[in-house]
Amino acid sequence: MTSQTPSLSFEVFPPNPAVGNEKILRALEDMQGLAPHFISVTASNNKYNIKETTVPLADHIQNDLAIPTIAHLPAIYLGKEKVAETLRDLDAVGVHRILALRGDIIPGVEPLKDFKYATDLIEFIKEEAPQFDIIGACYPEGHPDSPNQISDIQNLKKKVDAGCSSLVTQLFFDNERFYDFQDKCTLAGIDVPIHAGIMPILNRNQALRLLKTCENIHLPRKFRAILDKYEHDPESLRAAGLAYAIDQIVDLVTQDVAGVHLYTMNNAETARHIHGATHSLFKHHSQVSAL
């Protein structure tokens, strides 16, 4: 372990274009005051055009708010020409950090063949646009499509060797599983920073979606007890969910995690609450220039 001060970063997502940007822009103004190390902007591989959603929002965060920005790029349904176009769009607005993703496969929709794996995308970006810093995704409890964790970590090593400078994890609720994953990465020769993805569970609907979509994620007994006890008590569930996330973060920082990436769900109040409880543990984004 190292004694380097960890970073705190946020993830946001572009709203439905029909809804408009007013709410997310207000949330981002609030988040700006929290001085995150960076903000990542998600991209959908099936709903909205990246050029019309992710790129403008990343541009605003990077240039208007002066916060280092990472743009997500899921490529399974994009051909090389479309990826190259997206890279040009991001380059034009000075956003040079990308979270390179395969992207989720949509049932009944045939993927394109250019980027079957995230590694294919990473290699393409390194060849076509070497000015970009590439971040990879990783899964402490194994990718749902991997036969086992050994295979998953072998594939992760390929990502890093292809050009990832750092990694961000899928959300998890059991820190011990994250530490075990870190140890296995070290044994596999993966030596880039790994940022731990943390999502506070704040309401019943969010919890139900999680249980349905993230079947590979272990829910510790303490976490399940929160869901069971406060399922029909929204105020207490929110308070307990925030407390659980804060406990996770304090433990991670104690164990010298490289960084914590907070899945904010565009909720500035959540980001502010967690920042208020933990900000002294983290470094300000102006203190450093890279992940």
Positions of the model-derived regions?
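Conserved N-terminal beta1-alpha1 strand-loop-helix module at the mouth
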Residues: 2-41
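Active-site mouth loops of central-metabolism enzymes
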Residues: 7-23, 69-81, 135-151, 228-243
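Conserved, mostly hydrophobic/aromatic
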Residues: 11, 39, 90, 159, ...
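Active-site beta-loop-alpha junctions enriched in small/polar residues
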Residues: 12-15, 42-46, 72-78, 103-105, ...
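Active-site pocket-lining/capping segments in soluble small-molecule metabolic enzymes
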Residues: 19, 113, 117-139, 187-247, ...
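Glycine-rich, positively charged N-terminal anion/phosphate-binding segment
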Residues: 21-30, 47-67
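Glycine-rich anion/phosphate-binding loops
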Residues: 23, 75-89, 112-117
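Glycine-rich, proline-tolerant flexible connector loops at the mouths of alpha/beta enzymes
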Residues: 35-57, 103-113, 164-178, 264-267
